[in-house]
Amino acid sequence: SEMVESGELDAKYVHVESEHSARCCAMGASATGARAFTATSSQGLLYMAEVLTYAAGGRFPIVMMNANRSTALPWNIYGDQRDSLSLLDHGWIQCYAQDNQEALDMALMAYRLAEDPRVMTPVMVNLDGFALTHTYETVEVPTPEQADAFLPPYATTNKFDFDHPVNMGYSAGPEHNRYYKY
């Protein structure tokens, strides 16, 4: 948010009231053709579980960082992958970072993977809560030129087009459901 506020990052920062709303907002942004990102952890990830399947089913190439933390009860802020592992079959590609450099690198790789026309699937980058999220570690931040060379400009055909409307949120019977899920 500081980079957006200072103008260093050309992006919109949207403050929402919950993780459920954050996921819906990211889906809406992606549906209009914008590159979308959000982050969460633990109970927040479980709270947005309902709309994770909508993002996957809609083939929205959203990237989300998840600080892996234990789920309640008991409450704690330490690393535990129970939050993300409980959502393995929700249609998201999941990557697990070993250190903060990997987390940064995977964020860029996640966009490249998610936005590939052959993939068009959201990606969750997981990093250990507390061990990585609450400690300092030196990372090599790529220059904008390096990032641009690795990550092409975002251009998707999977977006709302008022001149060519499509049906989203449709129903699929048993004979077609497997095709959409797998």
What annotation goes with each model-predicted range?
Residues S1-S86, G91-W92, L108-M109, D128:
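Thiamine diphosphate
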Residues A11, W92-C95, E137-P142:
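Short, exposed beta-strand "edge-strand" segments with a Pro/Gly-rich flavor and a Y/T-containing core
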Residues Y13, Y47, Y54, Y78, ...:
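Sequence-level detector for tyrosine residue identity
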Residues Y78-G129, P153-Y154:
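Conserved thiamine diphosphate
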Residues V123-Y182:
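Conformationally flexible catalytic loops at phosphate/diphosphate-handling active centers
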